[in-house]
Regions:
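Juxtacatalytic C-terminal regulatory tail of Ser/Thr protein kinases
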Residues: 84, 101-113
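Residue cluster at the C-terminal edge of the helix-turn-helix DNA-binding motif
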Residues: 37, 77-85
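Minor-groove-contacting beta-hairpin "wing" of winged helix-turn-helix DNA-binding domains
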Residues: 88-100
Length: 581
């Protein structure tokens, strides 16, 4: 883009002219180059080393610190900016600078080629009116499937609020208007299910939140073998009701209609996968496996199975190399059957990044997933994580914010945004966002972990220690928590305690997978470089997904001067935009 606009200013990149309204603002070459670099990457931390390489390369004999400080001072003066209360340029202590004003460029779009929709719809949890509480999986599973189907049907014209925010209102007595205001949703779909033997009764109604006006309602009484047709009919009727002028026709993704048992297993898998953290992961894996065993051509179930297999690697329920290979097989099968399944493309993006280090292919897969279903929050979240790992922090936060708009109460999405702030060096913001997440769920272990890491980098080691000790009360034998605690103990000078924690983590290897990547972190804290690199080499052989964060993670800074570090990063295929920063 030739013209970059921000606030009252615009910079013509070709003519190198900065203007405020009709007036030309005089700016010397170096401040102008710094401004251009910041405008290309709004929200990103531009490090002092990066500025040195860009403006004062090797062989330039200047007092770098004095020259950079003078250039920043002149730039702030030209913009009328205040270093203490910045409207444009924020100083990130010990790192560099960040441009904090929005810059409306295509590159800063939250999603590849899609703007946020103006209208949003929330599918509220369907009530289970059956006497049998074990049928809860059916009402919750139906809710989740409607969320999944309406995304592609509405094709980005109407944003579909995600499952975490939807499930928050399960059993709520709040009025439609209040729920709509809380989630910024204009429409609500609500209903109930009642199962009696081989018959099922489903009632659904579409409501305009602001006026609480019912736009459409329908009651279905079918045999359980017709669940699929009911679900497809409900999704289609919603999309064609008052929303029909906004929504182009699209094909819903449904299961094979001659496999009702597979669909029932699929719903049970969705129900388990919706549970917090990794609580239901193993059960979800079992049900999705049963679904695709009964119906090998069930593409949506194969995609869901692939997603859970990736999660098995991320949560270390299984050796990552094994789990990711299984996920690739499932995702490939899903796309061969139906290339329009958004989730299968999103998982394929994860696998390109985790297994192959092919970041361009990963970005293309995420883009396709979001194109097929712009309400796919998991795809947006994964895309944001990839951007953060490439040091494209402004774009990463924009993608995460788009996902958060669709599912504001999803802890995973909020955590990705917080982690992005942490690796960008914005520790105080990361700390504040972690505390907000812990207000939502005080037992969210990931938030305690990121909070501890940010506190440690901010020089508040005792507080970091307290957070990890608190996290351990929720899961006393988690090897990652033990490794992170060992790292903090080591940094604080408690060597014997750190070594004891490492030994405790390693003792778990008899019964479960203990990720060497996190043991490497503990050894780094102790200054044990040989042990750290040995563990990182093993993490590479295991294809640990966390290894992609190596060059982003500030706690590994002590290893970066070691001659073994750069070859390892090259082997992992961490993106060039990160390497050398």
């Amino acid at each position: 883009m030739a013209i970059l606009r921000f606030g009252d200013f615009e910079l013509d990149v070709r003519s190198r002219e900065l203007r405020r309204g009709s007036a030309c603002v005089r700016l010397q070459e170096q401040p102008l180059e710094i401004l251009r670099l910041m405008l290309e990457r709004p929200g990103d931390v531009i490090t002092r080393d990066e500025l040195r390489q860009r403006l004062w390369p090797d062989g330039t004999f200047v007092d770098f610190e004095h020259s950079l400080n003078a250039a920043i001072k002149r730039l702030r003066a030209a913009l009328g900016d205040d270093a203490d209360r910045p409207a444009f340029i924020e100083t990130v202590p010990r790192r560099g600078y960040r441009f904090v004003c929005s810059v409306p460029t295509e590159r800063n779009s939250a999603t590849p080629g899609h703007a946020s929709p103006d209208l949003r719809l929330v599918v509220l949890p369907f009530s289970n009116l059956s006497d049998d509480s074990s049928q809860e999986y059916f009402s919750d599973g139906l809710t989740e499937e409607l969320i999944a189907q309406l995304g592609p049907l509405c094709r980005g014209q109407v944003g579909i609020i995600g499952r975490w925010s939807s499930m928050f209102f399960k059993g709520s007595l709040q009025r439609a208007r209040e729920i709509g205001e809380a989630l910024k949703a204009e429409y609500l779909l609500e209903g109930s299910t009642r199962r009696d033997g081989s018959r099922v009764r489903i009632t659904a109604r579409l409501v305009e939140a602001a006026t609480e006006t019912q736009l459409w309602s329908e009651t279905y009484e079918r045999s359980t073998a017709d669940w699929l047709s009911v679900q497809a009919d409900v999704a289609g009727r919603v999309a064609r009701s008052r929303l029909r002028e906004l929504v182009p026709p699209a094909r819903a993704i449904v299961a094979p209609r001659d496999h009702p048992r597979a669909y029932q297993a699929y719903l049970k898998g969705k129900y388990q996968w919706a549970r917090p953290g990794d609580v239901g992961l193993d059960e979800a894996l079992r049900w999705f496996t049963e679904a695709v065993t009964d119906a090998p051509d069930f593409a949506a179930a194969l995609a869901a199975l692939a997603r859970v297999q990736v999660a098995s690697a991320e949560y270390y329920h299984e050796m990552p190399r094994v789990a990711l290979a299984a996920a690739r097989e499932s995702a490939t099968r899903a796309l061969a059957i139906d290339p329009t399944v958004s989730e299968a493309h999103a998982v394929t993006g994860d696998l390109y990044r985790m297994l192959d280090g092919d970041w361009m292919a990963a970005e293309a897969s995420y883009a396709e997933a979001i194109k097929l279903n712009p309400s796919n929050g998991a795809a947006l979240r994964s895309y944001g994580l990839m951007l953060a790992l490439e040091s494209r922090y402004g774009e990463a936060l924009a993608a995460v914010e788009r996902a958060r708009e669709l599912d504001p109460l999803c802890l995973g999405t909020n955590n990705t945004g917080t982690w992005t702030r942490y690796v960008s060096g914005d520790y105080e913001s990361a700390i504040a966002h972690c505390r907000s997440m812990l207000e939502m769920d005080p037992e969210f272990v990931s938030a305690h972990c990121v909070l501890a890491a940010a506190l440690l980098q901010a020089g508040r080691g005792d507080e970091a220690l307290a957070q990890l000790n608190l996290a351990l009360t929720f899961d006393p034998s988690h090897p990652v928590l033990l490794s992170w605690l060992a790292h903090v103990k080591a940094v604080l000078g408690c060597r014997s305690q750190a070594q004891a924690l490492i030994a405790r983590a390693r003792s778990l290897e008899r019964t479960r997978y203990v990720p060497p990547f996190h043991l490497a972190l503990a050894h780094t804290g102790l200054g044990e470089r040989d042990e750290a690199f040995e563990a990182l080499d093993q993490a590479w052989l295991d294809r640990d997904p966390a290894l992609a964060t190596l060059d982003a993670e500030p706690r590994f800074e002590p290893l970066r001067s070691d001659p073994r570090y750069r070859p390892l990063v090259e082997r992992i295929k961490i993106p060039r935009s990160r390497v050398g920063v």
